[in-house]
Structures are given as structure tokens and as C-alpha cells.
Amino acid sequence: MTDSPSLESNNKSDMDTPRPPASSHDEHDAAESVSEKQDSATTSPTGKLEPEYLTGLRLGLVMFTIFVSTILVSLEIGIIATAIPGITNDFRKLDDVGWYGSATFILAAAASPLWGKLYKYLNVKWVYLSAVGIFLVGSIVAAAAPNSVAVIVGRALQGWGASGVLGGTLIVINYVAPPRNHPLLIGTWMAVFMMSTILGPVIGGAFTSGVSWRWCFWINLPVGGPIVVLLLLFLRVPKHVKPVPATWKEIILNLDIPGFCLLLVSLVCLTLALQWGGQTKTWDDGSVIATLVLWILLTIGFFIVEWLQGARAMAPLSILKQRMTWSNVIFCLVSYAALYQVMFYLPIYFQSIHGQSAVTSGVNTLPFLAFFALGAMVSGGAIGKTRYTQPYELAGALIMTAGMALIYILDVDSPKAKYIGAEVLFGFGIGLCNQVPMTAVQGFSKPDEVASATGIMVMCQTLSGAYFVAIAQSLFANRMLHALNSGSDHLDVALVLGTGASELQDVFSGDDLTAVIDAYMVGIKDVFAFSLACAAFSVILTALIPFKRLPDHEKKPSKDAMASDEVKASEEVQQEKKVTV
């Protein structure tokens, strides 16, 4: 990577005329990393600017702005669940139902590392605004969709923008807030994200039944407009969080477009195979087998390309090879699998088995939300004090597994006290450990790798959704249909699949309704069993996570250490110039 022309000329001049480190302009810029979180700054004896973080009202305004942006995009993740019946009534495309949710996760997973690179090389504020803009464009496309394909395209654009907003929010927190506040702020952000995601179906149900499913997307415009204004007014990244100098050609090469394309197409192939297999086509159908084979080949190709790309890869080996990173990546993938399945299928349990409306089922998930938020803030505050992360991942995984076991034993006649108790335990456990991997990876990353590391972690979170939500949907549909065909083969399978969970009581009656509810329970139980396995496996995975104390970046290094760091940074820049053509 080369410096800009002005920096390069300065470097040449400095090499010809030796001078003290304190006056070396090029070394000052080279050593200055993208994770320095200053607003105003003081100069150290080596010429580097010491960190001074936002506090008080200024920090509060930035946090408020990015948290509101998070609410905007996270509502759309869950809102589609109750909008689907209205969409299928308009377009009559039952085969596309799975894509309305999957398209968002697929684009979010594939694009997250790209956003991390963009935040590294470009102005943080304008990249963040671009992500919000793409999300709003996707909302317009979905709201005005003349057909089912347009809805899918709109949802994909929403996922693309949402990944930039979510990743950008975590990057901004890392840049502007004091390091010891990061765990609590990330925990609070995670609570806001989860509450918005789960309340999405409630809002979607109100719009779908009261106005139109299109308002699930139109509503983003009057809400998004003021958010853009807030971002323009209050999103202030510290002055010394500067983009890494690079030409446009270098930026494009570092985006790793080949890796992005391979990952995107592989996810599409897997989703197609899981949506066809056992539902619209048999598992031994040629198209199902072909898409599964393509998924395997493309995934292998993706890893080969990532290895060949080296430092330009979407997930650079220099970041992933660190034990603190790869162990938390795996833990994140598996724990999020348990979370997503409960998040999507617990409301289905309430609506299909207990006959609750979307609004009532949303109210019954509030205990889960409340204790998730409590767990996230407890672990965030505790990590801020102790600076250790692994104990909270272990404790959270254990409590989450116990709660998941209680959720698994729920049945058609389970009383309210039973499912509320299970929710509380699971919510508190997943809340304790959910945001910790992000905190750990950011905390142990090198300053110039924070943006890329954040992109990788957001990719893991959304990739877990892309993979495991699709797997859970396939498992649920296949097991439900098998149970239905075994007990009541006279029922119309297409009608059962096309009926929303909250509408079963209106469409079916008598023995048919009983048969459908029993079949739903079989499918839901298998999904919960899968989620329980993921939760239990996450307990084992905590043994891989290092027991280390988070570094305290607020401590000012000694003069000798700063001088040594500056020399190293200058040498790295000179070396990059030699190897970059």
C-alpha cells in the first residue's frame, strides 16, 4: 500500500534531511493508526498524539445517534416474519417465501468484511451514511415491489446496508469511547439490537393487519430521514481517526471482490438446496444435489482465494491466526445459531401452538428481551471492571444451555409459567455471553486492524443467520411435513406451508387443526433440539478461548516505547512502499 503523493514527497525529504522524531511529519502520519480515538489531542515527545476520548454529552449524542440507526435496521430483520402472509397473498409465490428472510442474511454476511475495509480506508462518517442510504433504497424497492422478485431484491439491499450500519456502529464505539467503557456500551448496543429485532414482528403484524405489508418498508423513510439528519449533526469521529492512505486502485484490490463473489454465490447455492430439499423437491433430485455440490466447491474455492489474497483477503490470515480471534469466531458462530433459532421459532411456537396473535406473542417474548438486556449489561459492566472476557462466555454458555433445555421440553399444553421461566434463563445466559466475542476481538486487535476485525465478527454473526436459519427452516419444514403426511395425508401441503403461524386457527378446524398443530410441534421441537446442541457445544468451545486480561489502551506508554513504536511504524511504511507496485 502506498501513501498519498504529499506524504511520499515528505518521506523523501525527511530521508535526505535527518531530524528529531518529534518533527518527522511522515512518521507522525504513518504511526498514527485508525484506532486512535482522540477528539482534541496533546502531542507526546515522539510526535504522536495521545488518546483523548469523547465523554459526557458529546459521547452521549454520538451513542444516541448510532443506537437509533441500529434500531432502524434491526427492526427489519424480524419484521418480515409477520409480513410474509400478506406478501404471499398478493403475489402467490410460495416458493419465494424463504428468500424474503434469507436474502437479507446472505447479503449481510457476504458484505460485512467489505464494509470493514471501507471503514478502514475511507471517512467513517460518510461510509456510515452510505450504509444507511443503501438500506433506505432497499426499503423503497421492497415497499414499491410490483412482484415477488422485487421484494427479494429490496430485502437483499436492506441486508447490504444493514451490515454496514451494524458494523459501523461497533467501529464508532471503538473509536470514540474510552476502552474500559467498550464492554458496557457494546452490551447495551446488543440489548438494543435484540429488542428491536424481536419487536419487529409485532410492528410488522400491526402494519400487515391494519394497513398493508408494504408499510413494513415504507415506515423506514419517515424514520430514516431524521436519522440521516442526526448523523450529519452529531456523528463526530475524533480528528485523529484517519483513513489508511491508499489509492482507489489499492482500495478496490483490498476489497477482495473475488472472495465476496464466491462467498455470496456459495450461500445462494446452500439456501436453494435447503429450500428445495424435502419441500418442493426430493433430496435426491438432480438440482438439489447439484446446488449442494456447488456450495461445497465454492466454499473450498473461497478459502483458497482467501489464502492467496493474503493481507487483501476479506478475512486476513494475520487476524484469524490469533487464537483470541479464531476461538471467538467459532464461539460466535455457534452461540448465535442457538440465539437465532429461538428468536425466530419461539414466536412461531406461541402463534401456532397457543394460537396467539403476532402482538400477543411479541408481548410474551418481553421476559426474554428484558433478561437478555440485563445479562448483556451485567457482563459488559463486569468486563469493564475486571478486563477478563472468557469467564463470562463460559457462565453465559452454561446458563444458556440450561435455559435451552427448558425451552426444548415445551409442548402443546405447556403453561405460561413454564415458557416464561425458560425464556428468562435462556435470555440471561445468551445476554451474558452474546456480545463478549466482539469485545474480546476488538480489544486484542492491533489498532490498524480494528475495522477489519469488526467486519469479520459482524460477518460471523450474520453468516450464522444465513447458514443456521436456513438449516433450521429446512429442518422444521421437513419434519413438520413428515409428521403431517404420517397422520393426515389428506391435508393440502401447500396450504399448510402458505398459512402464517398466527392464522392456523382461522384456516383449519377440528381434527385438521389438531393434526396441523401436532405437526408444527414436531418441527419446532426438532429446531429447539438443534438449538440445544449448539448451546451445549458453545460450552465446550469456551475451553479454546484464552484466559487473558483485556489491554488497557488508556494507559500512556513510556517515551521509549512510543519512540520504538514510531520507528517500527516508519519502517513498515517504507517496507510497504518497496513491495507495492
Swiss-Prot record:
InterPro entries named in the record: MFS, MFS_dom, MFS_trans_sf
Pfam families named in the record: MFS_1 (PF07690)
Comp. bias (Polar residues): 1-10
Annotated Basic and acidic residues bias: 24-39, 565-581
Membrane topology: Multi-pass membrane protein
Protein name (database record): Dehydrocurvularin exporter
Location of region: Disordered: 1-47, 552-581
Role according to the record: Efflux pump that is probably involved in the export of dehydrocurvularin.
Organism: Alternaria cinerariae
SUPFAM superfamilies referenced in this protein's UniProt entry, alphabetically: MFS general substrate transporter (SSF103473)
